[in-house]
Amino acid sequence: MKHGIKKRKLSRCTEHRLSTLKNLSISLINHEQIVTTLPKAKELRPYVEKFITIAKNKNTLHGRRLLLSRLHNSKLAVDKLLNVLASRYQDRKGGYSRIIKFSTRKGDCASMAVIELVDRDIAARGKVYSKNKEGGKVVTQS
């Protein structure tokens, strides 16, 4: 019985699911906006918000080491968390990200969503980056 278990399995084993969430959170921290499936976005949101809270409250060596251990030793993402995002969200108590339903994916009709950080860079606002079949990035206005 699944009493008290509210997490989505995302059709993956535990290690693969955690690795997927870590990789998605690194991408979201670096780019501040990503396009993914709706269940992944809903599962990713509390995961990333905990990282931002750690960066805000524990801007010490211990906090840096906590974030490095939980983000696959991605120094670029940890530096951005501690230097840029922690100062940006210093006055905000929560709700650092938003999920916007996007469209359905053409191949399997999966519901897609845009997850982005609130109060992100003004220059990047309104642009959604998605990959085309050739691997290049296409900018579309949302």
Curated annotation (Swiss-Prot):
Record keywords: Ribonucleoprotein, Ribosomal protein
Highest taxon of the lineage: Bacteria
Membrane listed as a keyword: no
Cellular component terms (Gene Ontology): cytosolic large ribosomal subunit
GO BP annotation list: translation
Keyword Ribosomal protein listed: yes
Molecular function (Gene Ontology), one example: structural constituent of ribosome
InterPro entries (UniProt xref): Ribosomal_bL17, Ribosomal_bL17_sf
Subunit structure and binding partners: Part of the 50S ribosomal subunit. Contacts protein L32.
Family of the protein in this entry: Belongs to the bacterial ribosomal protein bL17 family.
Protein name as it appears in the record: Large ribosomal subunit protein bL17
Originating organism: Wolbachia sp. subsp. Drosophila simulans (strain wRi)
Phylogenetic placement of the source organism: Bacteria, Pseudomonadati, Pseudomonadota, Alphaproteobacteria, Rickettsiales
Encoding gene per record: rplQ
